[in-house]
Amino acid sequence: MNILKKLFGGQKTTEEVRETKEKDFDKVKYEGVRALRMHQFDLAAKFLEQALQLDAEDLECRDYLSQAYISMGDLQKAYAQLQKISEAQTDNIAVLLRMADVAYMMEDYIAMTDVCDKALQLDDENVETYFFYARACKGLGDAPRAVSMLTAAIGKREDFYAARLLRGSILLDQAQLSEAELDATFLYEHIPGNEDVLLLKARVEKAQGKMEEAEQTYGKVMDVNPFSIDAYRERSEVRRSLGDSAGAAEDEAAAKEMGAEIPEPSEGIEQKIKEKMQQMDPYKVFHNEY
């Protein structure tokens, strides 16, 4: 029959058309995924967009496309793809949290709170949801609510160090020094060699006027990261308050020299995109593993 079709130009059956379309889809999708893994993001997006024209229901393809868009800095398009996935999988918390992550990069804190509300309705025990919610509240300038969300997360998982670090930083910004000290102390007792923890501890001590302790702690930050510009800059202020003008000048010079050699990180959305590009491990979109 196939020979006769070739000889006499018989038309393809519906099944043959479907099989051809599936093969074309698989080929184009594969090329898109390969380009994505090679960090050829523009090319990946083109292939994956073409694949979705062949099969708009393939959610995995939308996931890969969202990653390509994030890497290209097209966050609105990435968010739209994640919305499509979420509409198809309304109980998928991992997708909602990815939406919150992209909204955070866009500095769209209202969108973050919306998706976090949806995630909490599905599972109010998920500590990551509270963490994202807190970041949104911080972005909106609602420090008390951010602290409340972080406290809820820590209450559910005591070793949620990222939540404690963020809470301690917010409390420090709000001049709630005794509360910030509790978080800094807890973190220092559990992960003493962490640069961010040491920096928080030093800043709390500095704010409390414990200049000798702060000077020592800033030194520990430098032991972990000899290129911490913030540590040198802030320790120079501590040393100046202690009357060590020479030491302060030395730290200021070091900070200035490093600042000239190492470009300061760009702020805002651009920096968040760069950070996300450095985290290009595939998201587990189809499993609620947050």
Label the predicted regions:
Residues 39-46, 72-84, 106-118, 139-152, ...:
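Structural signature of tandem alpha-helical TPR/SEL1-like repeats
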Residues 54, 88-89, 122, 156, ...:
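Structural marker of alpha-solenoid helical repeat scaffolds
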